[in-house]
Amino acid sequence: MTDLPGLRVRAAAAFSLNVRLQLTFAVLLMAVAGFACAEHMEEVVVHGEPLSPFQAQAGMAPLAETNTALLLKRVAGANVNFNGSLAGMAQYRGLYGARVNTAVDGMDIGNACSNNMDAPLHYLPRTRVDELSVIRGIAPISSGLETLGGTVIANSTAPIFGTADGFTVSGHTAAAGQSVDGGYSLSGDAALADRRHRLFVAASYEDGSNRDFGAGTIRPSRYERSAVDLGYARQLTTGVLSIDYRRNDTSDAGTPALPMDDISSDADLLRAGYSAVWGVTGLDATVYWNDIEHLMSNYRMRPARSGMRRDNAAQADTLGWRVSVTRPLLGGALRVGTDGHAYDYDADVADPDNAMFFMQTFHNVKRDRYGLYAEWVHDDLGPWQLMSGVRWTHVSSDAGEVNASMAMMMPALAMLRDRFNASDRSRADDQFDFAAVAAYALSDSVSLELGVARKNRSPTYQERYLWAPIEASGGLSDGNVYIGDVELDEETAWQFELGLDWRTGRFDFAPRVFYHRIDDYIQGIPATDPAVIMVGVMNGDPTPLQFANVDAELWGADAEWSFAFTDAWQARGVVSWVRGKRRDIDDDLFRIAPLNTLVDLSYRAERWSVTLETEVYARQSKVSLTNGETRSPGYALLNLYAEYMFPRYGLQLMGGIENLLDKTYRPHLNGINRVAASDVAVGARLPGDGINIFVQAGWSF
């Protein structure tokens, strides 16, 4: 286990459009204003950050890869549920979707698609990624509001303050292209900075056609996305004040594993910050606001049956904050804090051929979370290092009354509507979490780690407020239609972990074994209500599923390792295995990654390097009968990368070939194809990319 590095204390404020939180924001804004007249000081580092010892970094794959989430395959225990070129959900140790807390530039982005086309990492284009890491094992309770499935941290590139009184200009530009979809990306950023000010602007653009695989083309899988970032920071006597804005526009992004495609996802992301240190006390606060408008369609990028053309317009607004104070206590560091996340959502379905048709899929949905926590870290107790924390989180949710034009002609649908509207939709949960991790150094190179935690998660709006059986399942992509349950209970997980860190400098090996016991796990089960079944039949699924509380358990092991043969020759790899089962019946959990490993062998000279990489996935035969999941065969891939640098000119060139042998393979975590006009059969799992030749160039100044 490595030493605990420094904690950078940050803070934030933002404009509030939510009346319920105006008082909170006013207090934070006044705190920022109170320091606005302060003078310059160096950025302060306070030791005691509890996250870094347990982080596992994702290797940086080529810029040509547009789906940022796919980088997670390079982390032990992590993977990605793939539904489209820009649609990827983080999976960690068999848990995914809302169970995995994902922080993008410190924000918990409330996405606008009920099928997670725009999962959080969608809003950090690959060209802007500076860091993508997973807090390995049990996530500290300070890392987020609901961290039952772990925490993923993604940060974009950002400039630093200058070292002189005069302003200097710096920046980076890059261009990349790849053959698998004829795609290309362009990006650039520039900064103007001195000791006290830091002004930043960045832009990126990505465009690609349908993706090829060994036996044809996946349709539709084309995409287009652009992003613009603006940022400003000011160093003050007691800290740093910053404000950042991102505009992300996605258009015509195919998602063949889902019933509709992403026609547009237009997002405004605003984050403001302030950091301060007084003596040994540090303040860290972040306030952010996200507004996302999203349009889905089942006919604009794929053929639709006559009379069944549909558009779905959705909007999501998020207001969030994190405030914490850190100071020494009993030889360690104590952090106390509060965080919150207020989320509003609406989604309406329309028929472009019939102005009278409408369906309020989700209406006036609110899901608000507020938390208080305390966490203590000590990294110098002789051979011991300790982290422990407790958290209280309040989750409240509600939804407005719904309606649908088809209810006038479908008594079963009218019954479901009336039952939902008459129900008590206002719900509240109080969660109590704790986490404790201890590491013991057996020697200078070997340490043991033991962790235990209790984590909770409340139902998502889909699981609770989906009032009619349709395929708005949070991106499960199993071909089933789902209906929610207002009466769902929260999930409660007991988590246990045992690990070893063996680090000699030349050889590093860090295995972990884990066990999760989850009570009231939320899973679709066969619906028994005749009205639900009748509407399901009319929607093309005679066996609809209803979200329900069941009992589950997951266990497994993962490891990361590296070995330096010489200063130039190095090998590294990760291996992951997880098993997920229902405890209430004899069935397996859905969409669990099979045993897999990634190994690369690299030769690194002063200015150039070459890497041969292999990915190996075992067959997955432990599948969910409830979800109708099919087994998948194993496969192995070879990738080749090369890089050359011209330090004198700030130039970097990179190229490579992925899937060198052009194998046809179907990753188990890929979704099920829904599109007839494709070389992939309807109901078959989406194949992985065929051979992909890519090149990229970058220039730093």
Outline where the language-model segments fall.
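Extracytoplasmic beta-strand/coil segments of soluble accessory domains associated
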Residues: A69-D108, R136
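Short acidic/polar hinge/loop motifs at secondary-structure boundaries
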Residues: D108-I138
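Outer-membrane beta-barrel translocator/receptor signature
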Residues: T127-R136, I141-G214, S221-A227, T238-G239
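Flexible loop and strand-edge segments within Gram-negative outer membrane beta-barrel domains
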Residues: G208, G214-A215, R219-R225, G239-L283, ...
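Outer membrane beta-barrel strand-and-loop segments of large Gram-negative receptors
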Residues: D229, A314-V325, T361, V365, ...
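Structural signature of Gram-negative outer-membrane beta-barrels, strongest in the C-terminal barrel
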Residues: R234-T238, D244, Y288, G331-R335, ...
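Gram-negative outer-membrane beta-barrel transporters
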Residues: L330, D379-L386, H394-V395, F509-A510, ...
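C-terminal beta-signal and adjacent terminal beta-strands/loops
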Residues: R457, D519, A618-K622, Y644-F701
